[in-house]
Amino acid sequence: MAFVMIREAKEGDCGNILRLIRELAEYEKLSDQVKISEEALRADGFGETPFYHCLVAEILSAPGEPQGPCVVGYGLYYFSYSTWKGRNIYLEDIYVKPEYRGQGIGSKIIKKVAEVALDKGCSQLRLAVLDWNKRAMDLYKALGAQDLTEAEGWHCFRFEGEAMRELAGK
């Protein structure tokens, strides 16, 4: 029987995090969207002023089992600000490898992010999910999250690439 530990990611975890980011993108049918590199993850998450923070779910083998520690999931988050509520935390990604789902690992990651949010004085933990990912939506609702599209009618938008350059006049 393996044990799961949720811990803060270290710079040396960036290769595993990138692998899991790619797996998540594949699962979401958006693998062509991943442009990030391991070097960028290192620079952006472990420099003097990190743009993100990350937790990893690591399987630790039980005594006598041959397999060593193995990263099987992650939660990548950053801090944001609401003009209505103040400090927020945004969970950009949460992913658990398929063979480890249904064991409470995703819940543990989300709960740990919630602990960080409260410790930092955040009033909200926000995240987004694709509309077809019912399993994830059911988990978030079971943990107490509110679906803002249903409840308040919010839609997410983004400016990217050429649209952002054009908007900025560059």
Swiss-Prot record:
Subcellular localization: Cytoplasm
Listed CDD domains: NAT_SF
GO molecular function, one term: N-acetyltransferase activity
Enzymatic reactions: S-(2-aminoethyl)-L-cysteine + acetyl-CoA = S-(2-acetamidoethyl)-L-cysteine + CoA + H(+); an alkane-alpha,omega-diamine + acetyl-CoA = an N-acetylalkane-alpha,omega-diamine + CoA + H(+)
Pfam family, one: Acetyltransf_1
Positions of modified residues (N6-acetyllysine): K29
SUPFAM superfamilies on file: Acyl-CoA N-acyltransferases (Nat)
Matching InterPro entries: Acyl_CoA_acyltransferase (IPR016181), Diverse_Substrate_AcTransf (IPR051016), GNAT_dom (IPR000182)
Family under the similarity heading: Belongs to the acetyltransferase family.
PANTHER family: DIAMINE N-ACETYLTRANSFERASE, THIALYSINE N-EPSILON-ACETYLTRANSFERASE
Oligomer status and interactors: Homodimer.
Protein name: Thialysine N-epsilon-acetyltransferase
